[in-house]
Amino acid sequence: MQMRDAIGAVMRHRHLSFDDTHAVMRAIMTGEASDAQIGGFLIGLAMKGETAEEITAAAQVMRELMTPVEVDRSHLVDIVGTGGDGANLFNVSTASSFVVAAAGGRVAKHGNRSVSSSSGSADLFDVAGISLELPPVEVARCITEIGVGFMFAPMHHQAMRHAIGPRREMGVRTVFNILGPLTNPAGAPNQLLGVYDPALLTIMAEALRRLGSEHVLVVNAEDGLDEISLAAPTRVAELRDGEIHEYTIAPEDFGIERQALAPLKVVTAEDSLKLVKAALVGEGPAADIVALNAGAALYAAGVADTLSEGVVLAQDSQASKLPLEKMKELADFTRILAHKDER
């Protein structure tokens, strides 16, 4: 399908087939489309509303063009959010990654700088002294030897550069805002994925089913968080064994008291790091929200058989203080690798 035809179709609110979307997105990500065409298509698609088929095709193109990380995928999980919830909480997903690693999971963390919060994964890793710009083979070593590896999105998705200008100038959400969680460079088959809009729950679960994921929990809290909330019930769309089931969970289901989110809000990455460190050793409300999310990730990864068991494993992990040691270990390891690459 030609760009002009695709723009006309989405402007008339016509859904595109997988093949047509794939062709258009490939033109965008290989530099064949003009900025005006990119902007027109993305706006038209957003106003129409993206289907699971269109999202799947767009993600497939990104996967075909990305720089992959080759690693064993057993018990491999990504903990990621779309961003866009505007809550400005500390980085719950990154803290959860270290808890999961200390409990026996393996985390391929795919992230970028902040979208909606004061501290994205990359921002936090910067202040924690964890090197971001490692080549794929060394990211794989981090995952294999420590249990956590961080894949800085711009290093693995260079094809995205063709859409940066139009996206920045438009300043609105487009399909690109939800593609990151669907394009893990290590091919993590399991995920805890937070979304900013409840309408995306089943759409994202269906897209991941089509892309071959094994066990995924897509979550959106009733208070708007793109993760499992400590302050409100959270809706879940769970993909497992090729089937999608929806249900709702709440903190009290796991013996955790509901608490306000205000103490978890941060302004800087340094603020976020303080709360992350508290969460990693089981201190305060930060520990509780991390236990919920890390527990869900342990369940998705197959380390725990149930969500409840996952939360207990996460709490035991925090009590051991090992997650904080994992973070220090990753900082030391990536520093050594980064210095080696500079020689």
UniProtKB/Swiss-Prot annotation:
Record-linked HAMAP family: TrpD
Keyword Nucleotidyltransferase: no
GO molecular function: anthranilate phosphoribosyltransferase activity; magnesium ion binding
Cofactor note: Binds 2 magnesium ions per monomer.
Cofactor(s) needed by this chain: Mg(2+)
Alphabetical list of Pfam families matching this protein: Glycos_trans_3N, Glycos_transf_3
This protein's name: Anthranilate phosphoribosyltransferase
Enzymatic reactions: N-(5-phospho-beta-D-ribosyl)anthranilate + diphosphate = 5-phospho-alpha-D-ribose 1-diphosphate + anthranilate
Subunit structure: Homodimer.
Binding-site residues for anthranilate 2, renumbered to this chain: R167
Keywords recorded for this protein, A-Z: Amino-acid biosynthesis, Aromatic amino acid biosynthesis, Glycosyltransferase, Magnesium, Metal-binding, Transferase, Tryptophan biosynthesis
GO cellular component: cytosol
Sequence positions that bind Mg(2+) 1: S93, E227
Binding-site residues for 5-phospho-alpha-D-ribose 1-diphosphate, renumbered to this chain: 81, 84-85, 91-94, 109-117, 121
Gene: trpD
Function in brief: Catalyzes the transfer of the phosphoribosyl group of 5-phosphorylribose-1-pyrophosphate (PRPP) to anthranilate to yield N-(5'-phosphoribosyl)-anthranilate (PRA).
